Design a protein with these regions (language model features):
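C-terminal amphipathic alpha-helical interaction region
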Residues: 7-141
Length: 141
């Protein structure tokens, strides 16, 4: 995972050198998303050996962080590649699409970090019967 993150960061650095002002928000949000992903990955790796249930409890939000960051990275690559394709409507849409994703969707990665690293205490606080009672009562409302 660390190698994958390092590859994304290195590719981002190379693109940053070529990208202009239009890529500012993409660059900022992708950098923040990568930081969140690296921190959350570090927590997962440190916690996994001693508390695998906590890692399992956080696995879904952790994978969502990965998806958001990789999506932003791929859209940024696509927008940069499309810059030289004048007259192509699909190419022209790449930059606004990447910017929209970076500004509207990618920031959710920061919010998911807390859920990914919250641990398993509350997940296992209720036994199965008690949880079933809660679900049945809630369904009636």
């Amino acid at each position: 995972m660390r190698l994958a993150l390092a590859g994304v960061r290195e590719g981002r650095r190379n693109r940053d050198a070529a990208a202009g002002e239009d890529f500012t928000s993409i660059r900022t949000q992708l950098s923040t998303g990568l930081d969140v992903l690296e921190q959350t990955t570090g927590w997962m790796l440190r916690t996994g050996a001693s508390d695998p249930n906590s890692v399992l409890a956080g696995s879904s939000p952790y994978l969502r962080i990965w998806g958001l960051v990789v999506g932003g990275w791929l859209l940024a690559k696509s927008a940069l590649a499309a810059r030289g394709l004048n007259g192509d409507t699909v190419a022209a849409a790449q930059l606004p699409l990447a910017r929209f994703y970076a500004e509207q969707l990618l920031p959710a990665a920061s919010g998911l970090a807390g859920a990914a690293t919250a641990g398993s205490r509350d997940l296992f606080a209720l036994d199965a019967d008690a949880l079933g009672d809660v679900v049945r009562r809630t369904a009636r409302v």
